[in-house]
């Protein structure tokens, strides 16, 4: 199910990131300490009153070298284009500024609900000063101290009140996949080429997210697919259409709806920071992953080229050791016929369930190979493990003390489970929990 999007907008130093972290709370996933996984948090999942939503800090998307007014204009444009609800953050300490008025005039033209959050109202005496913000013409200002958590509940109430009606669950028998990557890596050509391979019916339909185009098709075996085109990719006339900073949000929306994500890399240009950043989002979201190196026909090759590329990819994407790599050409259709079967296998891995008895046999064998660690004379005891969910496969390991489960031993257990059950192309999550 796709989540509605809430965008946080505002000039620098008004506390957007603090409010972002306060709303996201502990739902922000801990990024692995591996080079290549982004640590800047511009995207997280928020939840309030049993409603989940994607939370975007548009300030983290923008180009810091751009002129000041251009930056905040871009933020507002992104929010108006992509978000279901906009939270416009201003500073109660500084009052209304020219930049606030500039943004408010842009936001005033949108039909998207705008919530005006007056941040840094850190004591009751400051609440009397918020009324100046009525001059922005965006409705009631909400006093907030994101540092202390004061007033954030009122903002969250208003966010939930303005979220679109929840959509019905989508058909789970359909495999949904998306192609993500930098502009000009050949996503459009790959989409057209894939639709020319092993299909029975292909029909473009309006997607469930703003400006997305979904294409449904069925392969020769009767498996239904939905290919999620990056939102807005087929639109024209957008001044920021082919710039990386604006494609970030669109890629994240596509990732959110996908079961399997195809990370497309241009063989002519190699791996860039953007590739690692977006791949990190897909990994943290627990999606199935395939690394697709496109335009393979355009580069000179020898007997060592594939091995060199694979080694470089594994080095740059150390958090994607589970993701298969495939070298393709949208132009010549080289290896494209392998993609549907690969997507199906990864979808099966995402939905795989392991019986507890079989799982615990593997855990006990793993302990025999590598005994549990000790800390200050106390040894970790593993009582049993069980699978609690799929997409991605998630396992809970019940232990005597959670603190004794070092991340390296958890990683060892993950590798043993992978070796036993072949979870191709999908992350798996292991959680240590104290047995009660």
UniProtKB/Swiss-Prot annotation:
Positions contributing to GTP 2 binding: 181-188, 229-233, 294-297
Residue intervals of the EngA-type G domain: 4-167, 175-351
Gene3D superfamilies assigned to the protein according to its UniProt record, in alphabetical order: 3.30.300.20, P-loop containing nucleotide triphosphate hydrolases (3.40.50.300)
Domain KH-like: 352-436
Keyword Transport: no
Domain of life: Bacteria
Single GO MF descriptor: GTP binding
Biological-process GO terms, alphabetical: ribosome biogenesis
Family matches, as Pfam families: KH_dom-like, MMR_HSR1
Chain residues that bind GTP 1: 10-17, 57-61, 119-122
Keywords: GTP-binding, Nucleotide-binding, Repeat, Ribosome biogenesis
InterPro entries xrefs: G_ENGA (IPR031166), GTP-bd (IPR006073), GTPase_Der (IPR016484), KH_dom-like (IPR032859), KH_dom-like_a/b (IPR015946), P-loop_NTPase (IPR027417), Small_GTP-bd (IPR005225)
NCBIfam families the record matches: GTPase_EngA, small_GTP
Subunit structure as annotated in this protein's UniProt entry: Associates with the 50S ribosomal subunit.
Family of this protein: Belongs to the TRAFAC class TrmE-Era-EngA-EngB-Septin-like GTPase superfamily. EngA (Der) GTPase family.
Protein's UniProt name: GTPase Der
């Amino acid at each position: 199910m796709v989540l509605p999007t809430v965008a946080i907008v505002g000039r620098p130093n008004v506390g957007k990131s603090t409010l972002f972290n306060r709303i996201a709370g502990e739902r922000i996933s801990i990024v692995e300490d591996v080079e290549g996984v982004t640590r800047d948090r511009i995207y997280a999942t928020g939840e309030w009153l049993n409603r989940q939503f994607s939370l975007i800090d548009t300030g983290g998307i923008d180009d810091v070298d751009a002129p000041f007014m251009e930056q905040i204009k871009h933020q507002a444009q992104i929010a108006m284009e992509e978000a279901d609800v906009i939270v416009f953050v201003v500073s109660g300490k500084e009052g209304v500024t020219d930049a606030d008025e500039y943004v408010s005039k842009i936001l005033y033209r949108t039909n998207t609900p705008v919530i005006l959050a007056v941040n840094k109202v850190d004591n009751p005496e400051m609440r009397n000063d918020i009324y100046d913000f009525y001059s922005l013409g965006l409705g009631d200002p909400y006093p907030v101290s994101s540092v202390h958590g004061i007033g954030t509940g009122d903002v969250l109430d208003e966010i939930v009140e303005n979220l679109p009606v929840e959509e019905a669950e989508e058909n789970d028998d359909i495999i949904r996949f998306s192609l993500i990557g930098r502009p000009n890596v050949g996503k459009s050509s790959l989409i057209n080429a894939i639709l020319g391979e092993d299909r029975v019916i292909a029909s473009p339909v309006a997607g469930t997210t703003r400006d997305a185009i979904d294409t449904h098709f069925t392969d020769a075996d009767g498996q239904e697919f939905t290919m999620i085109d990056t939102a807005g990719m087929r639109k024209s006339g957008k001044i920021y259409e082919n710039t990386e900073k604006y494609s970030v949000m669109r890629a994240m929306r596509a990732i959110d709806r996908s079961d399997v994500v195809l990370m497309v890399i241009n063989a002519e240009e190699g791996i860039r920071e953007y590739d690692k950043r977006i791949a990190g989002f897909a990994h943290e979201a627990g999606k199935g992953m395939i690394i697709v190196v496109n335009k393979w026909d355009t580069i000179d090759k020898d007997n060592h080229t594939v091995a060199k590329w694979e080694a470089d990819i594994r080095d740059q994407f150390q958090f994607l050791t589970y993701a298969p790599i495939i070298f393709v050409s949208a132009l010549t259709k080289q290896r494209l016929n392998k993609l549907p079967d690969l997507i199906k296998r990864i979808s099966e891995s995402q939905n795989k369930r392991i019986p507890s008895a079989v799982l615990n046999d593997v855990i006990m064998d793993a302990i025999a190979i590598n005994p549990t660690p000790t800390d200050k004379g106390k040894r970790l005891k593993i009582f049993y493990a069980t699978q609690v969910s799929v997409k991605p496969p998630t396992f809970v390991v019940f232990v005597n003390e959670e603190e004794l489960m070092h991340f390296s031993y958890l990683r060892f257990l993950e590798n043993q489970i992978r070796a036993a059950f072949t979870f191709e192309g999908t992350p798996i999550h292991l959680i240590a929990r104290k047995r009660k």
